Regions:
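Cleavable N-terminal export/targeting peptides
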Residues: 1-24
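Short loop/turn motifs that connect adjacent beta-strands in outer-membrane beta-barrel proteins
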Residues: 20-25, 56-67, 92-98, 134
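Outer-membrane beta-barrel initiation region
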Residues: 21-57
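Transmembrane beta-strand segments that form the barrel wall of outer-membrane beta-barrel proteins
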Residues: 27-38, 64-76, 99-108, 140-145
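Solvent-exposed loop/turn segments connecting transmembrane beta-strands
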Residues: 37-47, 73-84, 112-118, 148-156
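Outer-membrane beta-barrel "beta-signal"
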Residues: 46-51, 129, 154-167
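Residue-level signature of outer-membrane beta-barrel architecture
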Residues: 53-55, 89-91, 129, 143, ...
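Helix-adjacent hinge/juxtasegments
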Residues: 78-102
Length: 167
């Protein structure tokens, strides 16, 4: 029941954010990859599929770099779900973009890996290449853990390929 509530809440927030972003332009990313890439036991590694929205209206250029909020989620092949919202930095070297991010979120293990808590933190580094005027192809590596706030803290390392498009 708790999982269903959070899923509906996330969907509602995501759709409202997307509707607001449609007034201008929206940056939507779709990604797929491997969950728990460095699985020592070999029993938790699975595929993942996700979506992420970046709000260009809230983009800020600061002395530390360019930042914007992100909201997204993914589901794994073992029915684990992670829903998150956070901030992403943007640093560019020509057509190459380096995009570090940090996102707290809600994790539901489903039939997959128990990360020890519903509250998990995702840190990610993404390297992207502008392939067309409004499109980007990226490689990401992320780590999700609960910072020892949960019963256990096994953490998980993930990697994925992302396609981003501004609509």
């Amino acid at each position: 029941m708790k999982f269903q509530f959070f899923t509906y809440l996330f969907t509602l927030v995501f759709l409202v954010t997307l509707a607001k972003a449609n007034e201008d332009e929206a940056d939507i990313s779709f990604y797929t990859g491997t969950f728990d890439v460095i699985d020592k036991e070999g029993d938790d590694q699975t595929s993942l599929l996700g979506i992420e929205h970046k709000n260009p209206d809230l983009f800020r250029n600061t002395f530390l770099g360019k930042f914007k909020p992100i909201t997204g989620g993914f589901i794994t092949g073992d029915s684990s779900i992670y829903l998150y919202t956070g901030v992403e930095g943007q640093y560019g070297i020509g057509p190459i973009k380096i995009l570090p991010s940090f996102s707290p979120g809600y994790y539901e293990k489903g039939d997959g890996k128990d990360l020890g808590s519903m509250l998990e933190f995702k840190s990610e580094i993404k390297i992207g290449f502008d392939i067309f005027e409004n499109s980007k192809l990226s490689y990401s590596y992320s780590h999700i853990s609960n910072n020892d706030w949960g019963d256990t803290n096994p953490g998980t390392d993930n990697q994925h390929i992302t396609f981003s498009k501004k609509f």
